[in-house]
């Protein structure tokens, strides 16, 4: 599993040496413009940024704070949201920024690595004649990468893990090779060098230098987000090796820059990349191959992190329910087809807009600084409420100060492409906010009825033979977690317009557990044999095939006598003659012109319903399509007050009452069907009594066929003192 950790979580931070030093030289005016002070200052800032941000903040502190093994900003928010509603704001903002960064990482990592092919002498002419060749190769690699995601990160991680192990070993060896000529660069371990150069007049980039240094820490947030995929212990075990390899390579590049700062061959070179130039031409071939592989792996780290984050956002009701697959046996390794497709299309769009890594890197990093800042805020709140208040203050002040410098420096990228990531962040944030607000508004109108309120009406409808059956069984799918009461939406659906009479009504909800293969259900029958509240508890790897489970429950209850016997005379989709017809009903909320809701609330609801329409339907999620489910729309926030009466403007016509052709009795003498003193009334009463008697006979026959209770409960059925014992009562809730 440690090899999987290498492949899944370290790809992003492992590609930073490809472009960090190159970006530093570009900001300082080239290799000829830097001196020893500049090189040591840059190395010092890089080393301490990796140490403080990645090692201290994420590896040593953040990873100790998990939600059932899951990491990331949403998992962290789930732990502390009880401390204030305002915490949703930084959590949403940080999550949106992370997802926006997930679009840019594959584009910048893979394109920058592929462009290394241009440094190989035999291929220089080919790329000069075909400038778009690099872009085409990058597109092919990205399409292949997203296509293999459905195989799961376990299989991908094993392959990528071995490659990353070779990659970081290669980084360390190349770094040591160049360090052997000048070990003095380790003076940069002194943080004074970094602070001094940052504020030195020789720093041509000014505060923007911190934006370059920040590139060395990209991937740190992915360590925390991907913790659920590979486990905290595996990251602890592998991180020391990763950090040593990174430091050796950065310092090796620094030693090469000091050794060649006066070499005209390199000082005149545009877009000089010390990473490739510090190697001999023969080694450079291997470097290009490995760097392309590392770029692919870096993309993998962000893709898996995006899957995890969207899954957590769904559980928080910040995003719509999406189809989730679990290719491996652990819940942390998941695959979301819709997210995979959106990321793929968005990444290709980035390549189409920015063309090459130079322009993509101008937009890269700004969104990630926002994620790191919001994570710091949430971690500080967690530490504060954990009783470590002094530590919380020190932690929050220190890391907010550092990351504020990163953010200010990265804002210089806004006009050079940073606007794109901000646009993506705003779009994702809009989805989260509107979905959350829309859900809150829907739940604000949700009401529940106690059994004493709904049972009399249902009992009357159940025994009213004058109304034909809508179906033998009507199954309502609901997201309501209440099991002791009934959602009024279901009650109104049953009685709206033409009442939906049935032999049995079912209200069904699904709860996904953290265990992979849980298959349980509980039933509440409210003391009747015609209404059942069912709650499924299904493991995250168990298929949510509701029709199959509903049939099992009906058979189970029929065998115990809790559900009256049913027989299907005509052919059905499920071909199950022992169960009557089943009709599934889904209730969707909708705004109406007369809905009484604020403009902001209406916007949130309309946006939510538009997103829901694009995200898919529960009909597909639960396999209901073959059963022709009924989708009902119920209005939100509609006033029950009658509108003012209309005024008629034309002249009303008086229609004379027709004269009867034969004498009729006085209306007062016409028997009332509900008047038991009249013949018709007595007939209706007799018919009702017959129906009730038939219902009692059916219930008694079903009870007689039911198997006797086992164990201690069976003893209660024995006679005492020659008198039959009372019939044992069924518990309100049974767990299967």
From Swiss-Prot:
Residues 660-677, 700-709 have a biased composition (Low complexity). It is found in: Cell membrane. The keyword Membrane applies. InterPro entries: K+_transporter, K_trans_C, K_trans_N, Kup. It holds the Pfam family K_trans_C. Belongs to the HAK/KUP transporter (TC 2.A.72) family. This is Probable potassium transport system protein Kup 2. It comes from Bifidobacterium longum (strain NCC 2705).
């Amino acid at each position: 599993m440690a090899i999987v950790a290498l492949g899944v979580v370290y790809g992003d931070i492992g590609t930073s040496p490809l472009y960090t030093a190159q970006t530093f030289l570009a900001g300082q005016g080239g290799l000829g413009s830097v001196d020893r002070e500049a090189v040591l200052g840059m190395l010092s800032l890089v080393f301490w940024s990796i140490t403080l941000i990645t090692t201290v903040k994420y590896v040593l502190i953040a990873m100790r704070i998990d939600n059932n093994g899951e990491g990331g900003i949403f998992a962290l928010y789930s732990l502390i949201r009880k401390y204030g509603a305002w915490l949703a704001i930084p959590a949403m903002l940080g999550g949106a920024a992370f997802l926006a960064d997930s679009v840019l990482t594959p584009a910048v990592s893979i394109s920058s690595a592929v462009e290394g092919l241009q440094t190989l002498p035999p291929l220089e002419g080919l790329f000069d004649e075909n400038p778009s060749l690099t872009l085409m190769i990058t597109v092919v690699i990205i399409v292949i990468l997203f296509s293999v995601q459905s195989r799961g990160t376990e299989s991908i991680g094993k392959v990528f893990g071995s490659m990353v192990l070779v990659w970081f070993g290669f980084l360390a060896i190349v770094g040591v090779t160049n360090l052997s000529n000048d070990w003095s660069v380790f003076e940069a371990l002194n943080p004074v060098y970094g602070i001094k150069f940052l504020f030195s007049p020789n720093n041509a980039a000014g505060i923007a230098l911190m934006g370059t240094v920040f590139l060395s820490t990209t991937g740190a947030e992915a360590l925390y987000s991907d913790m659920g995929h590979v486990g905290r212990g595996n990251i602890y075990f592998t991180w020391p090796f990763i950090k040593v390899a990174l430091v050796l390579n950065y310092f090796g590049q620094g030693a090469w820059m000091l050794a060649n700062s006066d070499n005209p061959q390199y000082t005149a070179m545009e877009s000089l990349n010390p990473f490739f130039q510090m190697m001999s031409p023969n080694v450079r071939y291997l470097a290009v191959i490995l760097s392309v592989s590392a770029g692919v792996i870096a993309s993998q780290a962000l893709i898996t992190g995006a899957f995890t984050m969207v899954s957590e956002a769904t559980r928080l009701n910040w995003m719509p329910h999406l189809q989730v697959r679990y290719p491996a046996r652990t819940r942390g390794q998941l695959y979301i087809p819709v997210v995979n497709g959106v990321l793929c299309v968005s990444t290709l769009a980035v390549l189409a807009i920015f063309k090459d890594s130079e322009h993509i890197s101008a937009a890269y990093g700004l969104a990630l600084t926002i994620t790191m800042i919001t994570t710091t805020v949430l971690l500080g709140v967690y530490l504060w409420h954990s009783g470590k208040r002094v530590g919380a203050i020190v932690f929050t002040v220190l890391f907010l100060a550092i990351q504020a410098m990163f953010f200010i420096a990265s804002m210089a990228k806004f006009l050079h492409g940073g606007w794109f990531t901000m646009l993506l962040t705003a779009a994702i944030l809009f989805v989260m906010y509107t979905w959350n607000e829309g859900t809150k508004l829907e739940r604000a109108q949700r009401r529940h009825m106690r059994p004493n309120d709904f049972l009399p009406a249902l009992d009357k409808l159940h025994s009213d033979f004058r109304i034909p059956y809508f179906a033998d069984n009507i199954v309502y799918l609901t997201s309501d977690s209440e099991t002791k009461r009934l959602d009024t939406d279901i009650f109104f659906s049953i009685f709206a317009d033409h009442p939906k009479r049935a032999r049995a009504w079912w209200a069904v909800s699904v709860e996904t557990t953290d265990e992979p293969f849980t298959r349980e259900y509980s039933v509440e029958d409210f003391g009747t044999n015609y209404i059942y509240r069912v709650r499924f508890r299904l493991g995250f790897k168990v298929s949510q095939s509701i029709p199959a489970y509903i049939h099992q429950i009906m058979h189970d209850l029929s065998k115990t006598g809790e559900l009256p016997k049913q027989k299907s005379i005509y052919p059905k989709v499920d071909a199950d003659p022992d169960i009557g017809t089943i009709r599934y009903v889904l209730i969707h909320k909708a705004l109406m012109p007369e809905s009484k809701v604020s403009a902001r609330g209406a916007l949130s609801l309309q946006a939510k319903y538009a997103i829901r329409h694009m995200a898919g339907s529960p009909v597909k999620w639960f396999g209901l399509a073959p059963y022709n489910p009924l989708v009902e729309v119920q209005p939100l926030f509609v006033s029950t007050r009658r509108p003012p009466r209309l005024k008629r403007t034309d002249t009303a016509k008086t229609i004379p009452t027709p004269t009867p052709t034969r004498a009729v009795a006085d209306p007062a003498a016409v028997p009332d069907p509900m008047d038991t003193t009249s013949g018709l009334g007595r007939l209706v009463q007799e018919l009702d009594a017959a129906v009730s008697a038939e219902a009692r006979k059916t219930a008694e026959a079903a009870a007689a066929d039911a198997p006797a209770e086992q164990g201690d409960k069976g003893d209660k059925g024995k006679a005492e003192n020659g008198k039959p014992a009372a019939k044992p009562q069924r518990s309100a809730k049974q767990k299967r």
